[in-house]
Amino acid sequence: MKYDILEPFKEYLYSQLPANTARTYYAAVNKLFKDIQFNSLEQIDKDWINEKCREQFKTRNEYSAVKNGLKRLKEYDSMLQLPSEDEFHAVSIKKRNRRKKPPKTIYLKPTQRKINQLSDEKLRYAYRLAMVSGLRVSELADLEASDIEINNEKIFVTVKHGKGGHGGKIECSPDSYLQKKLPEFLVKHKTDERLFYSEVYLRQKATELGIECHDLRRIFAITTRNALKKEMSVEEANAIVQQRMRHARFSTTKRYLFNRKLKFEYENVKEEGEE
């Protein structure tokens, strides 16, 4: 059956690639094959693959993920027949670079209130930690009890499997609530036990709250820079934010700090007036 092939392939990807890349490639391949059944990869027609990839994957990044995932699948099982590189390229160049999104506004205080009102402490701690650490949701889901350290009223988080291999130890922004609650939470878990829910579940629950998980990382970048600017030069503050975000280039960090399609406000004035 299909998943007798795909599940071992998933393990193969994780053994060959960084976790985030493996996750992206597998998700794309799994999406492609979602509505078909097969017992062997040689049963899949390469023309069907070409047409289905063209229809299902709208942006260049999405198309690249499924193309590279399929190439890895062929490495894993040579029975798979793929379109030629020229055929892949002919489709790729017609894809737009990214989905067009309307400008959005992130409201800090309403986001914090939504998180603080959560009755599930695992979700509440996870989302608050994301706001003060800048962790991606995949990194948050991977955290074990031994990855969090609290010293001298400071919280440190160790990321072992960051995007692009950029892990490291991160000093979190001050949060007196987490400084008090996390030690009590950590002692309930073994050192190698996952602290929070899966990435899929964290995203799902955030969506139900009306929050995008990556907005918590954006909040971290902006609030950290604003706080640091009061103590040092703008250049020094920018460098520290880049380091804590674990970006190889400041041009990546700039997309969080100076994105013209993104507005950052402390309060939703309309929401406050309506209340």
Where are each of the predicted segments found?
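Long, amphipathic, Lys/Arg-enriched alpha-helical "connector/arm" segment
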Residues: K94-K122
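Short, polar N-cap/turn motifs at the start of nucleic acid-interacting alpha helices
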Residues: I150, K230-L257
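N-terminal core-binding DNA-recognition domain of tyrosine recombinases/integrases
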Residues: L6-R99
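Active-site/catalytic core of tyrosine-dependent DNA strand-transfer enzymes
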Residues: S173-F220, R225-A227
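Conserved tyrosine-mediated DNA breakage-rejoining catalytic core shared by Y-recombinases
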Residues: L143-Q179
